[in-house]
Amino acid sequence: MASVISVLHGQVMQQDDEPPLAKRRRCREITFAGKSFYLDVPANRQTQLLTKAIGRLGGIIESFLSRDVDYVVTGSKKAVASVSSVATRRGEKSQIQAAERKEPIHCSRGKQLLKKVVHSQECNSVLTNARSWGVTVLYVEDVVSYIERLERPPSRGIQNKTAEGRAADSTRPSLKIARLRSPFIKIEDQSRKFRPLQCTFTSFPELSFVCSDKSPFETVQTVKKKDPGDQEEEEGQRSQKPQARKRKGYCECCEETFDTLSEHLVGEHHFRFVSNPLSYKMIDDLAAQLTCDLMELPFGSPTSPEAERSSQNEDWDLDLAPGEAEPAGNEGHELGILKATRLDKDGHADCEDQGAPAYLRDGGAEEPDQRCGEIPLANIEVDVYNVCSFDQPVVTCTMELPDVSAEGKIHSNLLGSTVGDERVLQRTNGTCEPHIDLALGNGRELKHAELQKDPLTKDSQPELLSTAHEQLPTSAPCMLLEGASVVHFPSHGGTVGSQGDVTSHSAANKPHTENCPVDSTGDRHAQPAGSDALAMSCVIPTLDNGGRHVDATMQSHWEVPLGCTTDTLLSYSTTVTVGELGPEAHNPTPEQQPLLISTCSSITTVCCTDTEFKSCTVSVHSTSHSPPNQNVKSNQTPSLLEMDLANPNCHRAKRKHWDSLLSPPGKKPTSPSHCQSLTLPMWLLCQFPNYGQQVQLPVWADLCKWDGTAAAEEGTVDCSSSSTLPKLHQDSFSSESDWDAHLPSFFQNNPQQSLQCGDLRTAQVTLNESWYGKQLCNILTHDP
């Protein structure tokens, strides 16, 4: 195209001093003036447009070819390509013809005649005459594009070329946009200063382990089959060329060279090296030193992003043993939920960061620093909430429990006997913050942790528990957390407590005297063996000197939840604790000592895998007391119930209703995970010392008077303490008026407690279950 432009107006383009715009206008005026054209193209629409354009630009169309024609326009591109050079002047015709001449080739006469005939047939007579006369031959497409370029209006993008002040018109270069087709590789510059590098492939390169003399990233080229004649010629040429030497590979594992990689990999020497586990010991040691932030998901955990975000707040939990019962002095109705958090990156928990006591951080009690590095610990976040009070939590603490998978795998999918020793929970003076001391039955002592409890009163502030004490004081009331075995049956069906055997723990759960103020005459706690499962026991009151207790656990069945395997089981169990308080508990009578009965219903979810044991137990506790003996001698040791009522620092939670031995009227059946009344079975009632005898049942007026004697001198009555004593009934049915039988007498004797009667009201009436309860609530809230 450039040659066409230079030929058509060569003398005009040589003037470089004129500006481009003026130069283009002048070219349009004198481009084809005085020029003659001969068109060697078929008659069509393009020929008509070309004839009109040449006429507008001042050119002349000749009808016959002659020596006076300046340009010959042809539609054959081969004829234009065969022309060696284009002459710009007629005086150079002889030089062009001399340049086209070739040296003669010696050939026979017959070949020369054949070439002449072929040449005459291929070449047109018009083009042959034009070449012989020195006329310029142009291709029709080049002429059309050139004319369109001349007739195009000037562009508006005129910019200054130089900074000296000379104006120059220029057009912006057009950007070439290409769309890459996969497979391709594109490398871009982040600063956008350099153009990107791209490379497209017909097929993406693949690793090749067959070729030994090439890179494994190079694709293997398939050999195309050729004709036999061509193969003979190539074989003759290959015989003359020296063959390239084949390169050999080197195996660093075997430290030897090989000719073919595929043959070496299946060889005996290399297979012996790979089969030896010590060959890669150095690599394993280096990999063991690296830290890995990834953690294995527990069995049955969700994999979706939404489920993972929701499961970050509640992970798989270690469980409390089925059946936890607490005394009335420390909030009998509580829902205990243990939430397990994850280990740190190294798989261990730091003693300094986990809030361990001072004697553990200072290096006491059986080398805890060494075990802290050896035993993997799991951070257990314990949140205990009141079942019926939703305004504030009762207990919030943090414990550390060992990973039971450190010693071995769990050999059974069912929860076996516990491996826990005694666990002591103590309240200090002036606060209700207990301290948890946990220990495994295999001799490993766990790390102590601080337990913080928020009192129920709004004015009181939570205080941290002091960890300086090592022995429990005998004067302060305390609770004992004992180990309890679990009876399991893989049967289905039934209700809570209807199936399963009963296991007595009167001898197996005796605590050590060095950790708890209990003078027990029975056998010491035996070391359990077998399963590595971990379970926490029920909470029962500490007995006085000479006291005894009977702890029975009933477990109905195991169930497999929907969408899970046999590794995830669901257990329902009920634990009943019967304790005799007082020094003469070995010969109990209804007139001598009070009787304490605690029931607990729990649902346990167990997840047994090859690496860890995790479960969650939701327990509901219920505690009741018989009336105290009015003829107790002054020299006798006060019982736990009397110490509890006399303690002014013990805060009690509000209750919606009390879970007595018989269900209250109008109570709807609920699941075992909620606050539900439990009825003792006949086999357990037969075991009571006072079974079959007439027992004097307390009434609320007597209980309030008896409770008020502790603070009669001060003129105040602890309403929260009185509300913790439940109402016992032997009748299976009662009316709503029976619940309010003793309310007037209570208000007459205690007029100062009118503003605090919410505890008594919520302990007697289920407010959310009847219209009668709502009306009673409105009446009792008015001031007298």
Swiss-Prot record:
Keywords: Cell cycle, Developmental protein, Metal-binding, Nucleus, Phosphoprotein, Zinc, Zinc-finger
Principal place of residence: nucleus
Residues annotated to bind Zn(2+): 251, 254, 264, 270
One GO process term, biological-process aspect: regulation of cell cycle phase transition
GO molecular function, one term: nucleic acid binding
Highest taxon listed in the record's lineage: Eukaryota
All copies of domain BRCT, residue ranges: 27-117
Start-end of Polar residues biased regions: 498-507
Pfam family, one: zf-DBF
Zinc finger (DBF4-type) stretch: 244-293
GO cellular component, one term: Dbf4-dependent protein kinase complex
Modifications after synthesis and translation: Phosphorylated. Stably phosphorylated throughout the cell cycle.
Location of the protein in the cell: Nucleus
Keyword Transcription regulation appears in the UniProt entry: no
Entry-linked PANTHER family: ACTIVATOR OF S-PHASE KINASE-RELATED, PROTEIN DBF4 HOMOLOG B
Function as written in the Swiss-Prot or TrEMBL entry: Regulatory subunit for cdc7 which activates its kinase activity thereby playing a central role in DNA replication and cell proliferation. Specifically required during the initiation of DNA replication in egg and during early embryonic development. The complex cdc7-dbf4b phosphorylates mcm2 and mcm4 subunits and is required for cdc45 loading.
Assembly with partners or alone: Forms a complex with cdc7.
Name listed for the protein in its UniProt record: Protein DBF4 homolog B
Source organism (scientific name): Xenopus laevis
Lineage, highest ranks first: Eukaryota, Metazoa, Chordata, Craniata, Vertebrata
